Amino acid sequence: MQRSIVLWLSLTLRPTRVLCTARFFEGQSPGLPNPAAMENGTGPCGEECPREVQETTITEGAAKIAFPSANEVFYNPVQEFNRDLTCAVITEFARIQLGAKGIQIKVPGEKDTQKVVVDLSEQEEEKVELKENENLASGDQPRTAAVGEICEEGLHVLEGLAASGLRSIRFALEVPGLRSVVANDTSARAVDLIRRNVQLNDVAHLVQPSQADARMLMYQHQRVSERFDVIDLDPYGSPAPFLDAAVQAVSEGGLLCVTCTDMAVLAGNSGETCYSKYGAMALKSRACHEMALRIVLHSLDLRANCYQRFVVPLLSISADFYVRVFVRVFTGQAKVKASARVKFSAACGPPVTPECEHCGQRHQLGGPVWAEPIHDLDFVGRVLEAVSANPGRFHTSERIRGVLSVITEELPDVPLYYTLDQLSSTIHCNTPSLLQLRSALLHADFRVSLSHACKNAVKTDAPASALWDIMRCWEKECPVKRERLSETSPAFRILSVEPRLQANFTIREDANPSSRQRGLKRFQANPEANWGPRPRARPGGKAADEAMEERRRLLQNKRKEPPEDAAQRAARLKTFPCKRFKEGTCQRGDQCCYSHSPPTPRVSADAVPDCPETSNQSPRGPGDAARPGID
C-alpha cells in the first residue's frame, strides 16, 4: 500500500519538477531541487521540503563535468582510456579528412612540422624558389583548424548516448577541425545535465544538446547532405539496436565508433543471445575476446551490406570489460559482393571429420565472424606516432602507446590465437616460457606474435599439427606420468603420437618482442577496487542504490543450504544403508557412519497371510492395543 502511494505522488509532482528544472537553466533559481527527493517526497505543498542537489565535479582531459552524486546519470571513470583513445583516433581521422581539403589541424602540445633539407639540383632549387615566390605573391596562406574553433568544412559529430556529455565536451575541447557536435540522450535528466556542462565548459558554439531516441535521430539523418562524419555509440550493454541506423546515418567514408560492454554474451556464455543480437554464435574459448571483436565487425558489415555499404576496420580494441571498434563506412556494390569472402561461416567451411584428428574430441563450431585483418596498421601507426610525440595530451598516453605497439606487432592475417596455459593444460605438462615457445616456432620457420587481447597469447601461422609436435617435444623434457592418463583423454591421444618435427627451444633474440623489451604498459592492472561495469542509471538516485544494496545483502546466499554441524551430518548419513555391509565386507562395525540395520520388508496390501486365526479376527478398534501380526 505504501508503494502505491509513492508512485501516485511521483505522477502528481512530475510537472512541478519540470518547472523547477526550467527555472534553473533560465537563471531565475539559484538551486535545483533533487529530482529523486521530489519524486519520493510530498511536493511543494508543505509536508516535506525538497533536499538540495548533491553534485560531484570531476576533471577529465580538458573538460570539467558536474553530475549528481546519486546514480541518476551514468558515468564510469574506468573508461577514461576509451575516451582518450577515441579523441586520438578522431584527431587523426580529422587530419586525414581535412588534409585532403588543404586544411591543417593544430593540436595543443604538438610541435610544428620541421622542414627537411635535402640535396636538390640547381634546376630543382630554382623551381622551388619560383613556386614559393608565386605562393607568397598571391597571398595564399595555409588554412588551419584549431581546437575549440568552428571549422566550416570540418567534421559533423554525433554522440548518440551522451549521458553527462563528457565525451562530446572533450571532443569540442581537444579535437580540432570540428564543425559541430550533437550530444544526444533520451533521458531528460541527462539532457539537462548536458546543457549545464556545456555552459560550464563554454562550448555552446560547438556542442548542441539533443533529447531524442538515438535510433530515430540517426534515421532522420539518412540523406547524404545530413549525414554525420563521425558517430560514436557507447551504450550500456549491447549496441545491436543502434547498428542498423548508424550504418545509414554515417557519411561516405565516415567514422563509426562502437563500444560493446556485453562481454558475457560475446564471450560465449549465452550463444543463443549472441546469435539473436549479432547474428553469430560465440565460442567459449580462450580466444573469446578477439572472437568478440570479429563478431562485432561481422555484425556491422552485415547491416551495412543491406544498404549497399561495407565497412573497413581501422582499429579494434579489447580492453578491460568491453570491446571497441573504429570502422569507416563506404558505398559500393562490388565491394559488398566481396564481403561474402571476408567472413567465415561454419556452414561453408572446409570438410572435416566429426572428431578432431589430434585430440579425438568433437569440434566446436561458431561464427560467422570477420576473417580479414581487424586493424589498419598504417592508421594505427599514425595514431601511435601522434600520441608518442605528445605524451602530455592524455592521462592514459602510456597505456595507449603500449596497446597500440602490441597491435602493430600482431600478425594481421592470422585470426584468433592460442594461450600457453591452454596448450600445457591439455597435455597435463609444465608450461613453457613465452620466449621458449616463440623461439621454437621461429626455429621452425613459422611466424609468431602476441595479441593485445590476452597477455599469454600466441598468435602464429603454424598449423595445429606443428604446434602439437612442439608441445610433444616439450613434454619429453618434462615427462608426464602416462599411467595416470585415461586412454580416452585428449592428453593420452596427443602424446601417443611421436612428433615429426624436432623442436629447438634455444632462445632467439627476435623472440622477445620490441614492446616487451622497452617495458611498455601493454596490459592494464586493476585500476581501482570494485572496478568494472557500473550499474545502470536510475531515476531513484542514491536512495534506489541503497535499497538495491540492502536487497542484495538480504538475498546473499539465499539459495544455499545453511551449514550443518557434525551431529546433523552424522544423523543424515545414518539414514543411508552401508553398501559394504550388504556385501559383508564392512569392517568398521558400529564406527561406520552409514546404517547397518537390515532393511524393513514392505508388505503389500494385497498380500494377506493365509492363516485361519487372522481371518476370524475382528477389526481392531481405536482403543485396542497393537497386537503382533497386525502392525
Residue spans for each PLM region:
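SAM-dependent transferase fold signal centered on methyltransferase-like domains
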Residues: Q2-D631
